[in-house]
Regions:
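A hydrophobic/aromatic-rich effector-binding and dimerization subdomain
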Residues: 1-16, 69, 73-116
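A generic fold-level signal
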Residues: 9-11, 32, 48, 56, ...
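Conserved short histidine dyad/triad with adjacent acidic residue
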Residues: 15-32, 44-46, 69
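Tight coil/turn sites that cap or link beta-strands
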Residues: 22-24, 58-59, 67, 88-90
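Glycine- and acidic-residue-biased ligand/ion/polar-headgroup-sensing regions
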Residues: 35, 39-45, 89
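Short acidic-glycine-tyrosine-enriched beta hairpin
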Residues: 51-65
Length: 116
């Protein structure tokens, strides 16, 4: 069985990044111990999550559940602009109410294998 590297860190309840890259190195499959939301703003990008590949278009929103193996595939030097949210699992659980599951978008993406 292949071992994937855990990457990234989250010392707060959440972090938000706005990134633009036009010459990115190849990124290997990896996972995080927090949830990730990615909003694709531009770029010629595919995103692989748990064995499924999604071709992204501007304004696509990608949900990556904590622990899911994923990686972006950057196809060319078109600027890859995105907003990324890292969200602690505990943070969502702390604010969850009986009739309001804040992690439902991540659970549904995983269950339905439809992350975009």
């Amino acid at each position: 069985m292949h071992k994937y590297e855990k990457t990234g860190y989250l010392t707060d309840n959440f972090k938000i990044f706005h990134l633009i890259d036009s010459d990115m190195p190849e990124i290997d499959f990896h996972f995080h111990d927090f949830h990730k939301i990615l909003i694709c703003l531009s770029g010629n990008i595919s995103y692989c999550i748990e064995g499924r590949t999604y071709d992204l278009r501007p304004n696509d929103i990608v949900f990556v559940n904590a622990g899911e193996v994923h990686r972006p595939i950057i196809h060319d030097t078109t600027p890859y602009e995105r907003i990324i949210f890292y969200i602690s699992r505990n943070y969502l659980e702390d604010y969850q109410k009986k009739d309001n599951d804040l992690a439902l978008c991540f659970k549904s993406a995983h269950k339905n294998q439809s992350h975009v």
